[in-house]
């Protein structure tokens, strides 16, 4: 990295939907780097609950007070190649468990083989949100009392979107 070059990082995920764990990661990473790109990765083999546009809107809503964060979308390429394309020197990954660590450690080695100039930074969220995942959140929606439960794990803007979506699907 050249002197006076902004320290840019990429934090990627499906964000379907964004959780408090994602928000924690974004908050931490944006304080560590000059610029953080939150990149929605499109996997055509994965069935998503929310459209790319809806996920972008939710991410914009929860990051609007972070001036150094921008939301982008990428597909059909490795994350490390995307990071290189946007001149990011860092990839930020969350570690929630030992299985996450094992997987991310292996990916870090592969990424290093593909782009040795890009470093991977691991962040570990606090215990109270470490087990929160988008898949878990989606699995809670529906049964009686789901709204109070889900409210604990997602940012308010995401919570409102989830309520509206559930209402529209059941109207």
UniProtKB/Swiss-Prot annotation:
It catalyses: (R)-4'-phosphopantetheine + ATP + H(+) = 3'-dephospho-CoA + diphosphate. GO terms for molecular function: ATP binding; pantetheine-phosphate adenylyltransferase activity. CDD domains: PPAT. Pathway: Cofactor biosynthesis; coenzyme A biosynthesis; CoA from (R)-pantothenate: step 4/5. Gene3D superfamilies: HUPs. ATP binds at residues 14-15, 22, 94-96, 104, 129-135. The record marks 22 as: Transition state stabilizer. One of its GO terms (cellular component) is cytoplasm. Its EC number is 2.7.7.3. InterPro entries: Cyt_trans-like (IPR004821), PPAT (IPR001980), Rossmann-like_a/b/a_fold (IPR014729). It is an enzyme of class 2 (transferase). Substrate binds at residues 14, 46, 79, 93. Keywords: ATP-binding, Coenzyme A biosynthesis, Cytoplasm, Magnesium, Nucleotide-binding, Nucleotidyltransferase, Transferase. Its cofactor is Mg(2+). GO terms for biological process: coenzyme A biosynthetic process. Pfam families: CTP_transf_like. It is found in: Cytoplasm. HAMAP family: PPAT_bact (MF_00151). Belongs to the bacterial CoaD family. Reversibly transfers an adenylyl group from ATP to 4'-phosphopantetheine, yielding dephospho-CoA (dPCoA) and pyrophosphate. Homohexamer. This is Phosphopantetheine adenylyltransferase. It comes from Neisseria gonorrhoeae (strain ATCC 700825 / FA 1090). The lineage of its organism: Bacteria, Pseudomonadati, Pseudomonadota, Betaproteobacteria, Neisseriales.
């Amino acid at each position: 990295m050249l002197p006076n070059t902004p320290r840019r990082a990429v934090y990627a995920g499906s964000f379907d939907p964004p959780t408090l764990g994602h928000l924690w990661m974004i908050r931490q990473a944006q304080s560590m780097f000059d610029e953080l790109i939150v990149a929605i990765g499109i996997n055509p083999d994965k069935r998503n609950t929310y459209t790319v546009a809806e996920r972008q809107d939710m991410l914009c809503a929860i990051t609007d007070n972070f001036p150094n964060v921008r939301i982008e979308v990428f597909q059909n390429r490795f994350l490390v190649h995307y990071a290189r394309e946007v001149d990011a020197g860092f990839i930020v990954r969350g570690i929630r468990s030992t299985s996450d660590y094992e997987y991310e450690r292996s990916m870090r080695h592969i990424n290093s083989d593909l782009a040795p100039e890009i470093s991977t930074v691991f962040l570990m969220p606090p215990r109270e949100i470490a087990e929160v995942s988008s898949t878990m959140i989606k699995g809670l929606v529906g049964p009686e009392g789901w709204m109070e439960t889900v409210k604990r794990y997602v940012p308010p803007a995401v919570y409102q979107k989830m309520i509206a979506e559930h209402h529209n699907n059941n109207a």
